[in-house]
């Protein structure tokens, strides 16, 4: 059986941790002037992927 392919887009966006997968938060690319400094600071923090989405990401990262 051939090696399974890793989804490269998913590999760049998610990192496997002991508690699941961590990801960057959205809403920090553009239209930043109307967002408060506090909101932008909190959006910089990484967060965990929802439990319901973990199996799909795990399928796309077979060697993670």
From Swiss-Prot:
This protein's UniProt keywords: Ribonucleoprotein, Ribosomal protein
Keyword Ribonucleoprotein: yes
Keyword check for Ribosomal protein: yes
Domain of life: Bacteria
Signal sequence annotation: none
GO-annotated biological processes: translation
Gene Ontology molecular-function annotations: structural constituent of ribosome
A GO CC term attached to the entry: cytosolic large ribosomal subunit
Xref: Pfam families: Ribosomal_L35p
Cross-referenced InterPro entries: Ribosomal_bL35, Ribosomal_bL35-like, Ribosomal_bL35_CS, Ribosomal_bL35_sf
Family under the similarity heading: Belongs to the bacterial ribosomal protein bL35 family.
Name of the protein in its database record: Large ribosomal subunit protein bL35
Taxonomic source organism: Shewanella amazonensis (strain ATCC BAA-1098 / SB2B)
């Amino acid at each position: 059986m051939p090696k399974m392919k890793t989804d490269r887009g998913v590999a760049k966006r998610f990192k496997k941790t002991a508690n699941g997968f961590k990801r960057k938060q959205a809403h920090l690319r553009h239209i930043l002037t109307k967002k408060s400094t506090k909101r932008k600071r909190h959006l910089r923090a990484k967060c965990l992927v929802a439990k319901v989405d973990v199996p799909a990401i795990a399928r796309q990262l077979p060697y993670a």
